[in-house]
Structure formats: structure tokens, C-alpha cells
Amino acid sequence: MTLFSSISSISSSISSSKSSIASFGNGTSMGSNSIACGGGCGSGNGFGGIFIGANIDLTGGASTSSGGRGGRPGRGHGGPHGHGRGGSGSGSSCGCN
């Protein structure tokens, strides 16, 4: 019986990790003018993530813009390496601003 309960707990942890993996890749996106600006442009949607202006959303939950808009609490930075941090919402971070 101990073996059965440990197997069922393993399978439940596997199914929960699948859902987290599915949400992990959700926010990766490329900005249309990233080539012209030498990179650092992109956007993402989600909840409570970090967005780095290298066109990669590390958590699938970006919520920032170059001016710090589009998130609660929402902080953003638009410089050559646009990046930001936010709560829920949507926005973009771009190094071209």
C-alpha cells in the first residue's frame, strides 16, 4: 500500500509540472522592429512575471512597458536594454524608446 501511495503522489506531481511547463512558454514573443533597433523589443501577457527586453519572457507572465505602465505594481525601463517587472496586465518593453 505504501508503494501505491508513493506512485500516485509521483503521478500527481508530474501532472502539475506539465501545467507549469505549458504556462512557461506562453509569453515568448518578438518585436517587429527588433532588428532595426538592434534587439531589446518585445511584449508579453500574463500574471506576475519578469520581462527582459531581449525578446524573451522568462516566466510566461510579463506585464510591463518601457514607461512602467501595464502592470500592478508595474515597473519598467526603456533604455537600450528595456526591461521591467509587473503584476497582472499586459504591456511591452522596448529598447528603441
From Swiss-Prot:
Where is the segment annotated Disordered? 1-22, 62-97
The UniProt entry, under Pfam families, shows: Coiled (PF05710)
Comp. bias regions, Basic residues: 72-84
Comp. bias (Gly residues): 85-97
Protein's GO biological process: sorocarp development
Q: Which family does it belong to?
A: Belongs to the hssA/B family.
Question: What protein does this entry describe?
Answer: HssA/B-like protein 44
Organism field: Dictyostelium discoideum (Social amoeba)
